[in-house]
């Protein structure tokens, strides 16, 4: 039984106990959303799906829209430190009391209907958005697309950043199957911006079935990287000598193309001023420089490959140490392999979740001669800190939870 005086932390503990084994089905979720008056929105809806780059694409959309004077809501997941990070209104998180109130509203209407944690908090987020007069709402898909809780809302424009191999136990073991799930966000006669160059056949099939209008990279829009600037090309505009960004250029370009396909007017001077300032915690976040201490949420092979490229760009002259925690359902070898020839010593440990790869499981994948398997991420980091010199680097990565645990340390 929920007490009306529950704090946010108590609410979250309660929500974590909700049905974890329920078969994903949006029917009941839509029923509750309709009762709450959430299915129809006056706001323009962006829905962002894809394997990598969802968060950074959302961040670019949010920044450019805000700096252009629009009222913007953002729903994203997971959070790194505090739950309130998941919902932003006009660039700011909300007070805990507002989240608690939205939870109470969902619980009153739920009346025993089984929901997962993510389904519950998605309804709560939509309640919060409804209370504000927003020009647009940006919804970051949690997992896949077709059966994701965010997909109860019909988007005006959807985005698929890319298609990679991840969450194979749920989405399928190949790109064709994974694309089929992500394309669940497609809507009839609506545009979907595609940032993937190697488009699986299933994406074309579903677009044809749903009469979705695909706007594809390298066909309808494109970008190119130069030495210290980049260019963007779209059917209506060409932008040259754009400043370098702190987020992946693929994310910046995908967001930019999406805005040009939307009803929103973004001035070129805003793009040039704002796009280089977009940053996202946990995405190649530099904590210090002497030595380099860098955190990154890379948790699949594609993201690990990008992380490896970013490490090359900063020209570390000394040794590189890695502090790594990974979930057991991930492609562990695929995550560590892109960095294998860079890492002098691995410090790895289980994470604080039942989904973690255990010490025994980690031992199977990491090289014996230069790996220490510790009890926790905190101990792993402290061990690395003993060895590191000012010309060296420590890279903390492998999962959102790895970065979250590290950033929560009182060090």
From Swiss-Prot:
InterPro entries: Folylpolyglutamate_synth, Folylpolyglutamate_synth_CS, Mur-like_cat_sf, Mur_ligase_C, Mur_ligase_C_dom_sf. Pfam families: Mur_ligase_C. ATP binds at residues 53-56, 283, 296. Its cofactor is Mg(2+). The keyword Metal-binding applies. Mg(2+) 2 binds at residue 167. It catalyses: 7,8-dihydropteroate + L-glutamate + ATP = 7,8-dihydrofolate + ADP + phosphate + H(+); (6S)-5,6,7,8-tetrahydrofolyl-(gamma-L-Glu)(n) + L-glutamate + ATP = (6S)-5,6,7,8-tetrahydrofolyl-(gamma-L-Glu)(n+1) + ADP + phosphate + H(+); 10-formyltetrahydrofolyl-(gamma-L-Glu)(n) + L-glutamate + ATP = 10-formyltetrahydrofolyl-(gamma-L-Glu)(n+1) + ADP + phosphate + H(+); (6R)-5,10-methylenetetrahydrofolyl-(gamma-L-Glu)(n) + L-glutamate + ATP = (6R)-5,10-methylenetetrahydrofolyl-(gamma-L-Glu)(n+1) + ADP + phosphate + H(+). Its EC number is 6.3.2.12, 6.3.2.17. One of its GO terms (cellular component) is cytoplasm. Pathway: Cofactor biosynthesis; tetrahydrofolate biosynthesis; 7,8-dihydrofolate from 2-amino-4-hydroxy-6-hydroxymethyl-7,8-dihydropteridine diphosphate and 4-aminobenzoate: step 2/2; Cofactor biosynthesis; tetrahydrofolylpolyglutamate biosynthesis. Keywords: ATP-binding, Folate biosynthesis, Ligase, Magnesium, Metal-binding, Nucleotide-binding, One-carbon metabolism. Binds 2 Mg(2+) ions per subunit. Gene3D superfamilies: Mur ligase, C-terminal domain, Mur-like, catalytic domain. 7,8-dihydropteroate binds at residues 116-119, 147-149. Mg(2+) 1 binds at residue 77. Belongs to the folylpolyglutamate synthase family. Monomer. Functions in two distinct reactions of the de novo folate biosynthetic pathway. Catalyzes the addition of a glutamate residue to dihydropteroate (7,8-dihydropteroate or H2Pte) to form dihydrofolate (7,8-dihydrofolate monoglutamate or H2Pte-Glu). Also catalyzes successive additions of L-glutamate to tetrahydrofolate or 10-formyltetrahydrofolate or 5,10-methylenetetrahydrofolate, leading to folylpolyglutamate derivatives. This is Dihydrofolate synthase/folylpolyglutamate synthase.
